[in-house]
């Protein structure tokens, strides 16, 4: 998997040993991008399209073209430049600049007990995996608004019909936040809400409370996880220029999703997309 972020290029790959590693998506020779596709499968090696340097899937240099014209190259020193990487419940995070801050999995550890019942290890992406949307607003404005539920009654008729007054935000120290929308006791005014409540097939591993709520976990500065009884999403914002933002996210379903849960996931998506114009 590759992606670009504000001038940086990242590559995440699983080696033959099954281990996941992250690298800068550039050749150690001249900085050319070694993988052009967004996602795919590398059979055994990665070859730079510029000068033909070849790398093993663990990032080490396998060989350079015309080796007789070059000095002996250490396979680690001249391998793909590594990135700091961390994994939390199957979600992979990379850090372009090493820092003293703790690993994200340590920061999010306070949510582990609650999140464990969602069995995130059983998720698989829907559709093409990731989606992007361009927004004509500064990324900080997008994030500031999304971080508070004060706007929900006016801006999100679907969520307001689903939750009623049962939505609250819980700021947590360390750049974290937790927001919960518990289902209102009524049947619902909107078609999608009425049928979602009627047909909802929640994940069996969830307790009674989490079978009837949507849980959001926010991570400063730009990441949100949405954990629903029928599916899981994430989304984040990246600045492009002043007044323009790219929002990127992913939608996930459970691997053993049956027809009822698929319908529930479809309805929850409809509810989530209902916004005031």
PLM features: residue spans?
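C-terminal catalytic domain of Rieske-type non-heme iron oxygenases
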Residues: 86, 91-277
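Rieske [2Fe-2S] iron-sulfur-binding domain
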Residues: 1-98, 102-112
């Amino acid at each position: 998997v590759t992606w670009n972020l504000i001038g940086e290029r990242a590559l995440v790959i699983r080696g033959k040993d099954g281990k996941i590693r992250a690298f800068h998506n550039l050749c150690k020779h001249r900085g050319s991008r070694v993988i052009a596709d967004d996602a795919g499968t590398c059979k055994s090696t990665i070859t730079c399209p510029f000068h033909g340097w070849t790398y093993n899937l663990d990032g080490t240099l396998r060989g350079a073209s015309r080796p007789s014209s070059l000095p002996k190259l250490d396979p680690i020193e001249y391998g793909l430049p590594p990135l700091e990487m961390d994994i939390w419940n199957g979600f992979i995070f990379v850090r372009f600049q090493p820092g003293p801050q703790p690993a994200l999995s340590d920061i999010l550890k306070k949510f582990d007990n609650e999140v464990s019942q969602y069995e995130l290890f059983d998720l698989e992406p829907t559709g093409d995996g990731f989606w992007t949307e361009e927004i004509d607003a500064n990324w900080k404005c997008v994030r500031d608004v999304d971080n508070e539920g004060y706007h929900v009654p006016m801006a999100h008729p679907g969520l307001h019909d689903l939750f009623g007054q049962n939505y609250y935000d819980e700021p947590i120290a360390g750049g974290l936040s937790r927001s919960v929308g518990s289902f209102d006791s009524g049947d619902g005014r909107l078609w999608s809400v009425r049928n979602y409540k009627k047909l909802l097939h929640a994940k069996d591993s969830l307790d009674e409370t989490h079978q009837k709520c949507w849980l959001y976990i926010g991570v400063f500065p730009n990441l949100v996880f949405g954990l629903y009884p029928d599916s899981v999403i994430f989304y984040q914002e990246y600045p492009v220029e002043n007044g323009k933002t790219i929002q990127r996210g992913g939608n996930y379903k459970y691997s053993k999703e049956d027809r009822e849960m698929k319908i529930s996931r479809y309805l929850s998506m409809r509810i989530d997309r209902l916004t005031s114009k």
